[in-house]
């Protein structure tokens, strides 16, 4: 049985990250009709499913995001979204109004991957944190992600300092892995 399915609701992105392979496909948004017809096709594979609205593209840029979230709720699907975080302030109310929203993962390294100016970095991080704080009070999981190596990681120290400011105290050592 499946536990999750990835649905690419758009392959359009508002950024051009240096670490993203991108796509040569025509840029488009999935229609509400296509999304609506896809959800019941997943039913035979599971009784409970997390729907991840991300493959390529920035899901928060979808002009009908609220409708897609409503359709997922009607089909009792929990929604997980991965975002670059730049549109969170604009979509906060839509996201937090969705009872089906389970998790939002924010790729904090996206800002640096777009030659993000250091003077705008604090504004970006503050907006992400404001969303994360509100979402957490509603029981939504928020994961703040950073590249460890091989990507846009030169600003990780500054981002970690920001996070330590927001979450003071001892932090466990990062997990290693292969």
Regions found by a protein language model. Give the residues of each.
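Conserved alpha-helical substructure of the radical SAM core
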Residues: 1-103, 114-122
């Amino acid at each position: 049985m499946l536990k999750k399915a990835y649905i690419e609701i758009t392959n359009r992105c508002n950024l051009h990250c240096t670490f993203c392979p991108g796509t040569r496909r025509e840029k488009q948004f999935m229609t509400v009709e296509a999304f609506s017809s896809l959800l019941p096709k997943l039913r035979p594979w599971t009784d409970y499913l997390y729907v991840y609205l991300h493959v390529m593209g920035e899901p928060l840029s979808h002009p009908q995001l609220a409708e897609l979230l409503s359709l997922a709720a009607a089909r009792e699907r929990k929604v997980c979204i991965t975002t670059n975080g730049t549109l969170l302030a604009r979509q906060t109310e839509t996201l937090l109004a969705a009872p089906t929203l389970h998790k939002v993962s924010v790729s904090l390294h996206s800002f640096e991957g777009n030659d993000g100016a250091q003077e705008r970095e604090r504004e970006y991080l503050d907006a992400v944190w404001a969303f994360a704080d509100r979402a957490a009070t509603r029981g939504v999981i928020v994961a703040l992600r950073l590249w460890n190596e091989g990507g846009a990681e030169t600003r990780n120290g500054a981002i970690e300092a920001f996070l330590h400011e927001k979450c003071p105290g001892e932090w466990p050592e990062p997990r290693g892995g292969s």
